[in-house]
Regions:
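Gly/Pro-rich active-site capping loops and adjacent beta-alpha segments
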Residues: 1-57, 130-198
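Stable alpha-helical structural segments in soluble proteins, enriched in small hydrophobic residues
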Residues: 58, 62, 66-77, 109-120, ...
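Short, surface-exposed acidic
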Residues: 76-80, 121-124, 192-196
């Protein structure tokens, strides 16, 4: 249950807190039962509408903390419990508007994270020569960039006379790195250097 203080104005109160459940619960497609309830209250406080993460971050924090606690109670590796229960490609997601995960490589991504982080060597903890303890942690998250079946996005790439590709996108880079990331994706698809994308 979530009680959300949305401030003195309507803003996006219900949709923001609603997404805290709809973006967190579907991460675990094997869940056969779930319940998500919330209330939004209006108070004489500053407006608390949509902002970075649009509600998803709060729900993901709650779910992922619970999964870690569950793994501890079961005596399981937190990485393993996620690998066994996370949503996989082709899986129906009743908690996400009845959508099917048609494009999902979360399992491959998490396997790569496990490998690159040296999880097996570092979990549950590693005692350093100086007596300090180091450990690793894991959490899953998903954040869509639109409202399913409503919002659409596109990118246009044109090849200039100088041999440089000009990419036009409708995304504003507000510190998220999307300009770099999208240029890297385009360079990989076009088999060219990153400097060839403008």
């Amino acid at each position: 249950y979530t009680l959300s203080n949305t401030g003195a104005y309507g803003e996006h109160g219900p949709t923001t807190v609603g997404l805290s459940g709809h973006k967190a619960i579907p991460l675990y497609g094997s869940a056969e039962a779930y319940r998500f309830r919330y209330d939004v209250v209006y108070t004489n406080r500053m407006s608390a509408g949509a902002y970075r993460g649009y509600g998803a971050t709060q729900g993901i924090f709650a779910i992922e903390t619970s999964v870690n606690e569950l793994a501890e109670k079961l005596g399981m590796d937190p990485m393993e419990i996620r690998m066994k229960n996370m949503v996989k490609e082709g899986q129906f997601m009743p908690a996400y508007y009845g959508e099917t995960a048609n494009s999902c490589a979360l399992d491959k991504c998490l396997a790569r994270v496990k490998e690159m982080s040296g999880w097996d060597e570092k979990y549950p903890r590693k005692v350093m020569p100086d007596g300090k303890i180091r450990s690793v942690g894991v959490a899953l998250a998903m954040q869509g960039s639109c409202i399913s079946n409503v919002d659409v996005g596109s990118a246009t790439i044109k090849l200039g006379e100088d041999g440089v590709y000009n990419m036009s996108i409708a995304a504003a880079d507000m510190g998220t790195g999307c300009d770099t990331i999208l240029a890297q994706m385009a360079a990989e698809c076009l088999d060219c250097d990153l400097d060839d994308i403008a």
